[in-house]
C-alpha cells in the first residue's frame, strides 16, 4: 500500500546512491545473502522510510527474511523510496503525510504477517503488540528499537514488568548515541531548517530545548554556523554540562524572549506552548527534531493565528506589538 508505483525510478536512484556510502551494510549484505541467516522468518520493519533505511530492508530481504515495511513517522516517509522498495519485492504499507488512522492501519496490516522479528523506531509497533495485537506475542522471538523515545517507552514497560518479549535497545549502543544522535541529528536538523527557511543562522540566537545527545549535536552545529546558542534543560547535570560547553542555560519562559530559531529535541510533550508563544519575537522560527510531533503545541499556535498561510502561522502577541 504505497502512493504510486510510478515513483519507483526516483527511489531506486536514491537507494543506489546511499549503497555507495554504506560499506558496513554492504559487507553484511554480501555475507548474509549467502548464508540466508533469516531464511523462513517474517520480519516487520517500522522505520523512517527513506533511502538508507530502505537499503537496510533490502539487505534483510536478501538475507532470507520475508520483510514488511511501514513508516515510523508519516512526515518522514518518502513516497518514491516506498515505491522502489515495493518494486523490489518488499511488502510496504506507507504513504507520506498519512492520517493517524491510516498510520495505525498500516502498522496493523504489517503485523498481519505474524512476525518472528521486529525492528521498531519510536515504539508504536511495540505498543500495538502490547495492545490490540497482543495475540501475536507468542510467536515473536524479539526485536530491536532504534531511537531514544522508543527506548524510553521500552524501559517503562520493562520497569513495570509488562514487556512481553526481548528487545535490543539500539539507542544505548555507543555507535548510535555518540555518532548518529549527536552528529547525524545535529547536521540533518540544520540542513532541514536552512533548506526550508533559506535564512542565515550566523548571528542569530538559537534556542535548543534538551541537551541529550541529539540536543548536544544540534547546539554544537548551531554554534559552528555562527549562532548564539541558548539551551533549556530540566536535568541540572546536563544543564551544567551545557554551560561548560560554552552555552547559556535558562528556562524556556526566559529563552523564548530571545530566540530567532527554536529547535526542540527532548522527546517530551508541550515543551513550547502558548505562554512561550506570547513572548516570542515576531518571525521566530519553530522546529522539532524529536521523534513525535508533540513538543511544540501546534493547537495553541493555531488558536493564536490571525492570518494562516501555507508557509507560516502569523499571530499577534505583546512581544510583536
Predicted segments, located by residue:
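Glycine-rich phosphate/diphosphate-binding loop of Rossmann-like nucleotide-binding domains
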Residues: 50, 187, 194-256, 264
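Histidine-anchored nucleotide/phosphate-binding helix
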Residues: 50-63
